[in-house]
């Protein structure tokens, strides 16, 4: 299935749904140069856990994930 990832640019990824969020972060790192530990992936504004698969997170075909930078402090 196709998945859109919006970081500095909009990327289209071909995925199966079995990939983990951590794997998607690693792919984004190779595309954008943002370290995985500095990324937060969001689906409809909800942060996704690294160890969860895309299917477990409710990601469907043609979903758009937003990449946000991790904020320090509070």
Curated annotation (Swiss-Prot):
CDD domains: Ubl_FUBI (cd01793). Transmembrane segments: none annotated. PROSITE patterns: UBIQUITIN_1 (PS00299), UBIQUITIN_2 (PS50053). Pfam families: ubiquitin. This protein is synthesized with ribosomal S30 as its C-terminal extension. Belongs to the ubiquitin family. This is Ubiquitin-like protein FUBI. The lineage of its organism: Eukaryota, Metazoa, Chordata, Craniata, Vertebrata. The gene is FAU.
